[in-house]
Amino acid sequence: MSNKKELLWASRFNEPFDSEALRFSSSVHVDGKLYREDIQGSIAHATMLGEEGIISADDAHAICRGLKEIEKEIETGTLVPQWEDEDIHTVIENRLKEKIGAAAGKLHSGRSRNDQVATDTRLYMRERIEELQEALNDLLGTLVQKAETYKDSIIFGYTHLQRAQPISAGHYYLAYFNMFNRDTERLLDLLMRVNVSPLGAAAFAGSTLPLNAGRTAELLDFSELFTNSIDAVSDRDILIEFISCCSIVMMHLSRFCEDIILWSSYEFGYLEISDAFSTGSSIMPQKKNADIAELIRGKTGRVYGDLMAMLTIMKGLPLSYNRDMQEDKPPLFDSAETAISSVTLFNRMLQHTRLREERLKELTKKDLSLATEIAEYLVKKDVPFRDAHRITGKIVSWSIENQTPLPDIPLERFREFSEVFDEGIFTALTPEASITSKKSHGSCSFESVERQIREARELLG
């Protein structure tokens, strides 16, 4: 192999490109990840060129054979891109020239690096969307299993991080099921826009060669073909949308991780994480830290940064292609890899968590979270809700001042606040009764949770 690095555009210039400028502008250390997609796109392009008679069938065959050999060389480490190569497209084309000679120069007929890299990026995103979908579907399955396991367990529901009302633990897990399911729907919707071939747009204005863009789209399994050559090479909105989807996934993970971190702390003590997903302290022997959950929570900020980076890169660019767009790869790769690995590891961690049901049972029995049941009990007695709310607030205040749990307040004391109280109030003041009595659609009642679990299982097939 020759050590001479030939830049694809150098013939126009009388002076060699400054070495520091080349090092600064080289992207091969980043876009090297796209070698499979680049070779896949080039094979499709060469096949089409041969079929359309733009190049000979022999040249097309030689190009495709050489590209497949180069793919193996990169995979085995025989061919290692260097920064002097500028980008992965240059690496592959220069190596192809070394392997098959002048025929390699025909590969780029009717093609620009602009539509080439746009194609590579879409192929990459298509694969990452499928991987992220698969990871999310696995997580959805775990959430349904958790909901089934803990459907009869009672935990606190929170607002403002204050205990609010008792709920079925299954209802809690199903809340996250719905969030992550919407993430899969967003990705599926995005896939329709990603799966559009830009190959054939050339630099931005098309080509005078009789390219068959529909054929390359077919060979690359794209479902649609671009309609405007400028748009095909100059926008990165689908990339931004993908990172946005990753950001929402990470936001949902981060919220879930926050619950796990809090609930596994000594102060809460609701949940236990397996030792396999916990770490200790180098100085405090007693520590058991939820580091994996904390790391996922921290990585969320990084993916948000990827989204802001892309929005900022694109915000002032005139049509069509600009070299600024080279900077789209680090945010894309980072957000995809972070989201996929985070969902995968979170799912494994979640599978190895358990609720501390005995502690939760004791806490929910004697808690102020049953106050709403008093207010709704009064409403059922034909007391206007605002009056019921005011009366219940006074009862709660008395309960706190006298250190008496709501279920332990004597009936005569209840009747001092309102004469409509009778023995039925004590039937309502249990966590089980609170949950069972919920009648509204999608509520936390045990019956509703059972229905939600069935629907979730049907959704997953």
Curated annotation (Swiss-Prot):
Database matches in InterPro entries: Arg_succ_lyase_C, Argininosuccinate_lyase, Fumarase/histidase_N, Fumarate_lyase_CS, Fumarate_lyase_fam, Fumarate_lyase_N, L-Aspartase-like
Pathway assigned to this chain's UniProt record: Amino-acid biosynthesis; L-arginine biosynthesis; L-arginine from L-ornithine and carbamoyl phosphate: step 3/3
Keyword Amino-acid biosynthesis applies: yes
Disulfide bridge partners, by residue number: none
EC number: 4.3.2.1
The keyword Lyase is assigned to this record: yes
Broadest EC class assigned to this enzyme: lyase
Cellular compartments annotated: Cytoplasm
Catalytically driven reaction(s): 2-(N(omega)-L-arginino)succinate = fumarate + L-arginine
Primary location recorded for the protein, binned into one broad class: cytoplasm
An example Gene Ontology biological process: arginine biosynthetic process via ornithine
GO CC, one annotated term: cytosol
Record-stated family: Belongs to the lyase 1 family. Argininosuccinate lyase subfamily.
Name recorded for this polypeptide: Argininosuccinate lyase
